[in-house]
Amino acid sequence: MTAQLNPFRNAFRLPTKQRINWFPGHMNKGMRQIQQKLRNVDCIVEIHDSRIPLAGRNSQFFDTITGSGVKPHILVLNKVDLLGPKQQRSVLQQLRRQQPELKNILFTNCKDQRNHGVLDILPLATQLVGDSSRYNRAQSAEHNIMIIGVPNVGKSSIINVLRNVHLKKRSAARVGAEAGVTRAVGERIKIQEKPAVYMIDTPGILQPSVTDDEMGMKLALVGCLPDHIVGEDLIADYLLYWLNKHRRYEYVEKLSLSSGPSDNISAVLAEYAQTHGMFHRVKQYDGQVEVMTNLLAAARKFIQFFRTGQLGSINLDEHA
């Protein structure tokens, strides 16, 4: 009996040998500024995207910032509204199994000011600071909390939510839909009066080189890298690969694919574009204008479906 061939790829490879690399000048500057301010920091709050609990979290960077565990540390997994309760439990077990040194983990949705995880950040940080040896800051009544993490995971948004909740004041940290809005380590932002708590916003820091294709594509898919750095067509192709690999075929109905699951991103995008009237006019070399399916618009829509949770709750580090 002939074994049935797997119609899908069993590995994802970039079309060129060039690795994804996004470590612009403001990140180098940010790293130096972070290290300069550490002496006056009492607690580190690391914000990360809950859909990639492992990918992009630099252990060497973590050790440098926390002093190998000397400074209190909280891992905040944000955007939990895109994960779901069942996936939360799975992620928690995964982290405790692979990184047992992580003691303080919170799941948050920074879009909801009543979210329990968001409301727990400040009390937990205050408790950890109170229980820690503050050394040169032992006489200070103020608490300084530094917010760190990769780009576009909601660091500035969480600062603004906490400021609004505890001080009833408007936003103080810049936010944006794309990675890289915060480009320098900010000044202290007051979050609470008694005790006086200040937060320090920082630019998103990635490893100087993303040496693993899968890690780079996961970061790109959740928006930690600007889409144009990687290319929407490549991001959409990785999304298709991941969904097929994990037998998550919800995309077939969402994209109105009459032929069922496919491993051909060009065919998938072309069918979706045709079905939904996505066309654009392209001028040919001979000057003639041809109406063609807009594959880029279709790729952006496919990515948007994932980022807004319309393809279901997904942990991209599942089985990692």
UniProtKB/Swiss-Prot annotation:
Keywords tagged on the record: GTP-binding, Membrane, Mitochondrion, Mitochondrion inner membrane, Nucleotide-binding, Transit peptide
CP-type G domain span: 31-208
GO biological process, one term: mitochondrial translation
Any Gene Ontology CC annotation: mitochondrial inner membrane
Topological category with respect to the lipid bilayer: Peripheral membrane protein
Ranges in a coiled coil: none
Keyword Iron attributed: no
GO molecular function: GTP binding; GTPase activity
Residues the record lists as binding GTP: 78-81, 152-157, 204
Cellular localization per UniProt: Mitochondrion inner membrane
Sequence similarity: Belongs to the TRAFAC class YlqF/YawG GTPase family. MTG1 subfamily.
Function: Plays a role in the regulation of the mitochondrial ribosome assembly and of translational activity. Displays mitochondrial GTPase activity.
Protein name listed in UniProt: Mitochondrial GTPase 1
Native organism taxonomy: Eukaryota, Metazoa, Ecdysozoa, Arthropoda, Hexapoda
